[in-house]
Amino acid sequence: MSEQEAQAPGGRGLPPDMLAEQVELWWSQQPRRSALCFVVAVGLVAGCGAGGVALLSTTSSRSGEWRLATGTVLCLLALLVLVKQLMSSAVQDMNCIRQAHHVALLRSGGGADALVVLLSGLVLLVTGLTLAGLAAAPAPARPLAAMLSVGIALAALGSLLLLGLLLYQVGVSGHCPSICMATPSTHSGHGGHGSIFSISGQLSAGRRHETTSSIASLI
């Protein structure tokens, strides 16, 4: 019995292949959250890229400075979001990360996405407020209509991103306790099954011993 008890903990460990498969499954946890963050990233890339190209293509001598600066900022912001998505996909395909907190940071819906959305919201908000302030500063009675409208739109978009990120973080923090509470119950369930199996094994061994002794006495 002592040898069986010594071999039991070793048998409970997972083989390396199963551990590798489990690491790959870490990237696909919480699919709804991942899909939401992916949609937001695609919207940022498409919106900022299209807006930046539109401003750069309509640059003229009269309004060249602010259109050139704003279009460049929007294009760089779209490039930043795109690079983050490509980097996460490349790291996932290469399977070069074996730590859970690194996967949770880089996967879709993780900490890196929240940081990118925060940076994008701040950049859009600051750019929009700057454009609106510059449009109203020279002549408050007749501000530049295009500059003011672009500034208000960018400020509103940045505010929506920051508000959405705040609500997202509140929702994530609200779901964390329930997940943490569900994990110990799962482990306790597995422990209960293990105890049932061990008890049944001991009972079957005892019955075999009694059967053997009775046969020996009859002989």
Curated annotation (Swiss-Prot):
Record bears the keyword Transmembrane: yes
Cellular location(s): Membrane
Transmembrane parts of this sequence: 36-56, 68-88, 114-134, 147-167
Effect on the protein upon substituting R107L: In a breast cancer sample; somatic mutation
Membrane topology: Multi-pass membrane protein
Pfam families per record: TMEM125
Keywords, alphabetical: Membrane, Transmembrane, Transmembrane helix
InterPro entries per UniProt: TMEM125
Cellular-component GO terms for this entry: membrane
Protein name per its UniProtKB record: Transmembrane protein 125
Organism placement in taxonomy: Eukaryota, Metazoa, Chordata, Craniata, Vertebrata
